[in-house]
Amino acid sequence: MDRELVMRFLGTGGAVPSKDRSHPGLLVEFSGTKLLIDCGEGTQRRAMEQGVTIHDVDAVLLTHHHVDHVAGLLPLATTVDLLHGRRLKVYGPTAGSESALDISDLEVIEYREVNPGDEVEIGDLRVLVYESEHGVPTVDYRIETPKIPGKADPKYIRRVPPSKRREVLLRGERPYSLTKPGKISVYVKGDGRPADPENVRGCQVLVHEACFEDHEEAVRYLHSTHLEAAEVAREAGVDLLVLTHLSTKVDPERMREEAREVFPVVVVARDGLMVRVRR
């Protein structure tokens, strides 16, 4: 089984894109399974520029239906239909009255509504759904791999019959295992007020929106700041915090330095960033 989950940040901007930051799009890959979280304008082109194929994704996970998160969905679904002759599987919350796209009327999309508390198995990944406060139906996603066996010690594993080795490594028995067994978990925060640290606990990586630097502005528009994201990361005990969905108004370098005063391991995402999470 693969021991690595890869996250590729296709778009890291806010509602207004810039020359450096496009509308949101995050590709998660593990053991042949591909999930695309949100699909803003131009997502296919950005993937091509980064040398990534997304027309073979297993599913798209929408955090909500604002236009900056869904404008690239119909073009991608059309590509999937033309190249593969199938409908694009899309999961997300109820569209609501502010939806930018009436997905239910699109023949090239197979839409499944998810709600907070739901769990979905997609390929080799398990997806848990949590509520986000954003004024419209919005969700966060916790993505987990299956349990990964401990890494074998070649000096000792030969003593175990081949048919028993996986069982031994899944238990993490010493001296046969060099590492403890476990799973990879990442939490992707949809637009909205800060994530609940209890929902994030146990994850290695927290991807959190940081649309604003100013707290009052974040509260007014139901978004989050970099400092609030850092507080969540500290309370949840993650290994890495990645800030994304940045407004054109913010200073990314200042945000990173200020966030590091609260939580030490912070990366401000940029379009093209790749994060590898190993077990």
From Swiss-Prot:
SMART domains: Lactamase_B (SM00849)
The entry's keywords: Endonuclease, Hydrolase, Metal-binding, Nuclease, tRNA processing, Zinc
Leader sequence residues: none
Active site: 68 (proton acceptor)
Binding residue positions for Zn(2+) 1: 64, 66, 134, 191
Enzyme Commission code(s) on record: 3.1.26.11
Domain of life: Archaea
Pfam family, any one: Lactamase_B_2
InterPro entries: Metallo-B-lactamas, RibonucZ/Hydroxyglut_hydro, RNase_Z/BN
Similarity annotation: Belongs to the RNase Z family.
Name of the molecule in the record: Ribonuclease Z
